[in-house]
């Protein structure tokens, strides 16, 4: 069949004018087209993106499609603004398919203005369990889930904005000594159980520690403010920008404003009363925040499905630091 990208985007945007939770039915061939075309672009762009401000940065979405549309209403629909998303598009919410399809469609339509990084949920071993596989199988088939897996294995994993703001989904890594280590990661790749790529997608800051400690998630590490400070100094950077953790106001600073956590799914999972946030970076690298207040509780886009909040992960033992 002839695939019309603009028609796909138009249909994906229709729920803007309907009630939250309305499903968008794309043809399976259209979704496969999105995964294949986007993969080609990801592979042809660097795994460590070098981007320029102005840009808007968003944290976890987790299938809360109506909230993704609200973010675009606030920030301007592409190509009105440049965007960088920090991962975790799927799982937990009810509309992972619409969410990832719109993001891939915009990536194909505006490859130099619209960027998405890999989160720890863009990984088959995680999204097999936490909702995305079930959604693909229920609405289409498990082969389509495999097509997304192949696409996710090619996503970029970090970005640097104007040589000053270092962005990733999770956090820093004790193995990260220079940026070329990231550039040398070859794709397609699965997320390993430990090491640099794992940490970029899984690590968390912790205000109660110094240095590195094992992470309660059972994967990767936590790191103290001292780690952030010395990392920024060494690499002549100003800010680490990451996602991966629910924060009450949608954004939260750490280490004397040298690290910021962004989370863009308000009322996360139907169980939290958090706001969502998007960070705007202007040409002078001034950062400002747009807040999505928690919407009313009757919203249909969140659903707990009784899934635990922190995914345990079957893994080999990682080396001690």
From Swiss-Prot:
Q: How is the cofactor bound?
A: Binds 2 manganese ions per subunit.
Residues binding Mn(2+) 2: 88, 120, 169, 244
Show the CDD domains listed in the entry.
Answer: MPP_PP1_PPKL
- Give the region (Disordered) as residue ranges: 298-321
One GO term of the cellular component aspect? Answer: nucleus
Q: Write one Gene Ontology MF term.
A: protein serine/threonine phosphatase activity
Instruction: Name the consequence of residue 269 to C.
Output: Five-fold increase in phosphatase activity, decreased binding efficiency to dpiA and reduced sensitivity to dpiA inhibition
Residues given in the record as Mn(2+) 1 binding sites: 60, 62, 88
Q: Which UniProt keywords apply?
A: Hydrolase, Manganese, Metal-binding, Protein phosphatase
- Source superkingdom: Eukaryota
- Active site positions: 121 (proton donor)
E.C. numbers: 3.1.3.16
Q: Which reaction does it catalyse?
A: O-phospho-L-seryl-[protein] + H2O = L-seryl-[protein] + phosphate; O-phospho-L-threonyl-[protein] + H2O = L-threonyl-[protein] + phosphate
One Pfam family it belongs to: STPPase_N
User: What PANTHER family has UniProt attached to this entry?
Assistant: SERINE/THREONINE PROTEIN PHOSPHATASE, SERINE_THREONINE-PROTEIN PHOSPHATASE
According to the record's subunit comment, the protein's assembly and interactions are:
Interacts with dpiA.
What is the role of this chain? Protein phosphatase activity in vitro.
Q: What is this protein called?
A: Serine/threonine-protein phosphatase PP1
Q: Which organism is it from?
A: Dictyostelium discoideum
User: What gene does the UniProt entry assign to this protein?
Assistant: pppB
